[in-house]
């Protein structure tokens, strides 16, 4: 950190060699392992910054960030807004109800409109998979994916990885990656962009990933992503080091995928009894929002020694500060950039 508490660039890479050559961040799938580790290292420094009494800097002073959310959000929108403001940027929030999409404007026209506003970065959440890639191809500034349909939610996976790394370090089990860990993700895998991004991120960091869901909520061919599928929750939990629970995304379900919430909890809810099937010191995670009494019991979610759910929320601000900082470096004239900013970065 500098004398005023502002983080300096990670020392993982030699001077002049930029570790993140991408103009936008729309998915984990396009990241190399060293790029994921670089983002986490940069975010690590912002964790310390955010724990100071003075949590504001002028790193992005004079820059404008648009948070364009075409889907409702609470924690993700707040996290990005806080991240931008702590960096000193001017942050403008655009909600779905306020957008011209409600009046019939096409996504391409929306992208053209956003580009004409000359923002320095745009954060986008959209209900359609691939929408963020499309917008990124039409604008001249960095784009961050805050979740698109059932596709990806990259900053969620990064903050989950950072929260897990922090928890392991607190136990004296610190390592830059997750080699040797078995992580079970259980819930609505079919509709979950969080699951997809986490599978990619956790595997890139060396973890073995299991996914568990009722047959109707398990994507066909999920094993092609390298995850081991289970329908039996008890079997999926056996000996795992981390249990990551996901909510049922009823807003994306057009039919009856489960008999009832009560039946789902009976078969797939994480209880104290089920937690005993995991490794003795297994950690519990949930990206939120939680449906207590459905996918997870309150006494499990609130376990001080095992649950790192609130830590996940804390890490979200740090990860998003790091991403905003890194992606705007070329626009701020900083040296060491190897990539090209602009259209088609993730095509």
Curated annotation (Swiss-Prot):
It comes from the Bacteria. Keywords: Pyrimidine biosynthesis, Transferase. The keyword Transferase applies. InterPro entries: Asp/Orn_carbamoyltranf_P-bd, Asp/Orn_carbamoylTrfase, Asp/Orn_carbamoylTrfase_sf, Asp_carbamoyltransf, Asp_carbamoyltransf_Asp/Orn-bd. It catalyses: carbamoyl phosphate + L-aspartate = N-carbamoyl-L-aspartate + phosphate + H(+). Gene3D superfamilies: Aspartate/ornithine carbamoyltransferase. Transmembrane segments: none annotated. Its EC number is 2.1.3.2. GO terms for biological process: 'de novo' pyrimidine nucleobase biosynthetic process; 'de novo' UMP biosynthetic process; amino acid metabolic process. The keyword Transferase applies. Carbamoyl phosphate binds at residues 75-76, 125, 153, 156, 288-289. One of its GO terms (cellular component) is cytosol. L-aspartate binds at residues 103, 193, 247. It is an enzyme of class 2 (transferase). GO terms for molecular function: amino acid binding; aspartate carbamoyltransferase activity. Pfam families: OTCace (PF00185), OTCace_N (PF02729). Pathway: Pyrimidine metabolism; UMP biosynthesis via de novo pathway; (S)-dihydroorotate from bicarbonate: step 2/3. Catalyzes the condensation of carbamoyl phosphate and aspartate to form carbamoyl aspartate and inorganic phosphate, the committed step in the de novo pyrimidine nucleotide biosynthesis pathway. Heterododecamer (2C3:3R2) of six catalytic PyrB chains organized as two trimers (C3), and six regulatory PyrI chains organized as three dimers (R2). Belongs to the aspartate/ornithine carbamoyltransferase superfamily. ATCase family. PANTHER family: ASPARTATE CARBAMOYLTRANSFERASE, ORNITHINE CARBAMOYLTRANSFERASE, MITOCHONDRIAL. HAMAP family: Asp_carb_tr (MF_00001). This is Aspartate carbamoyltransferase catalytic subunit. It comes from Erythrobacter litoralis (strain HTCC2594). The gene is pyrB.
């Amino acid at each position: 950190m500098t004398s005023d508490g502002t983080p300096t660039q990670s020392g993982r890479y030699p001077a002049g060699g930029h570790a993140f050559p991408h103009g936008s961040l729309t998915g984990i799938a396009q990241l190399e392992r060293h790029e994921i580790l670089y983002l986490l290292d940069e975010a690590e420094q912002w964790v310390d910054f955010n724990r100071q009494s003075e949590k504001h800097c002028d790193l992005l002073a004079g820059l404008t960030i648009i948070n364009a959310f075409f889907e409702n959000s609470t924690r993700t929108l707040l996290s990005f807004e806080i991240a931008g403001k702590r960096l000193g940027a001017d942050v403008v929030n655009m909600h779905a109800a306020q957008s011209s999409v409600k009046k019939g404007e096409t996504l391409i026209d929306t992208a053209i409109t956003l580009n004409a506003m000359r923002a320095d970065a745009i954060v986008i959440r959209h209900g359609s998979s691939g929408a963020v890639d499309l917008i990124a191809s039409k604008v001249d500034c960095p784009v961050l994916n805050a979740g698109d349909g059932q596709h990806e939610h990259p900053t969620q996976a990064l903050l989950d990885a950072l929260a897990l790394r922090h928890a392991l370090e607190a136990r004296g089990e610190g390592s830059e990656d997750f080699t040797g860990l078995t992580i079970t993700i259980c819930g609505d895998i079919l509709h979950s962009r969080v699951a997809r991004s986490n599978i990619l991120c956790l595997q890139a960091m060396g973890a073995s990933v299991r996914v568990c869901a009722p047959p109707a909520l398990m994507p066909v061919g999920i094993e092609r992503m390298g995850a081991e599928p289970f329908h039996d929750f008890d079997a999926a939990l056996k000996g795992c080091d981390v249990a990551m629970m996901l909510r049922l995304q009823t807003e994306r379900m057009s039919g009856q995928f489960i008999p009832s919430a009560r039946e789902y909890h009976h078969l797939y809810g994480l209880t104290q009894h089920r937690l005993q099937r995991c490794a003795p010191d297994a950690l519990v995670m949930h990206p939120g929002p939680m449906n207590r009494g459905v996918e997870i019991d309150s006494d499990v979610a609130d376990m001080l020694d095992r649950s790192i759910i609130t830590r996940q929320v804390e890490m979200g601000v740090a990860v998003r500060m790091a991403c905003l900082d890194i992606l705007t470096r070329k626009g701020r004239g900083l040296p060491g950039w190897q990539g090209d900013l602009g259209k088609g970065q993730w095509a």
